[in-house]
Amino acid sequence: MASKFFSNLFGVVDDEPETADYYEDQQPAQQAPAPVPTPAPTRSNKVVSINNARVAPQPNSSSKIELVEPRVYGDGKEIVNHLLNGNAVIVNFDQMDAKVAFRIVEYMKGATYAISGKIERIDAEIFLCTPQNFEISGKLAPTLSSDGLDDRGDRY
């Protein structure tokens, strides 16, 4: 009915009678087959829930301290892998550009935070990263704060 109103309004003539909508089908309606239940989709292992995330391993007798002297930003992955394997890492940035070293330190800070570890500055360009199962005693330099500044106000 609304279509007839708009057709007349815009001057379009419709030759088909409107009563075609009122005819009933001569055949009774067929019943649709019952829906077949589909199996529930399986979960993909590409997404890891927080509860299943990797946690720092428990202390064992094979814990090591790794020494790393990165040359490029990609070497940061090696440092984080050592941490995830439960080893402490001493990192010397002496041979690296300061801007790239800063980016690696930020990467290391994120990794140590994720495994509840610690990162400490030993010297101007030397850092100690430890997983949760290591205890650091003594204090050579201040611990890095979350904003990247140590107690001396140095940024790293």
Curated annotation (Swiss-Prot):
Region of interest: Disordered: 17-44
Location in the cell: Cytoplasm
InterPro entries for the chain: Cell_div_SepF, Cell_div_SepF/SepF-rel, SepF-like_sf
Subunit structure as annotated in this protein's UniProt entry: Homodimer. Interacts with FtsZ.
The protein's name in its UniProt record: Cell division protein SepF
Keywords assigned: Cell cycle, Cell division, Cytoplasm, Septation
Domain of life of the native organism: Bacteria
A GO cellular component annotation in the UniProt record: cytoplasm
Gene3D superfamilies (alphabetical): SepF-like protein
Protein task: Cell division protein that is part of the divisome complex and is recruited early to the Z-ring. Probably stimulates Z-ring formation, perhaps through the cross-linking of FtsZ protofilaments. Its function overlaps with FtsA.
Family the UniProt entry places it in: Belongs to the SepF family.
Record organism: Limosilactobacillus fermentum (strain NBRC 3956 / LMG 18251) (Lactobacillus fermentum)
GO biological process: division septum assembly; FtsZ-dependent cytokinesis
Pfam (any one): SepF
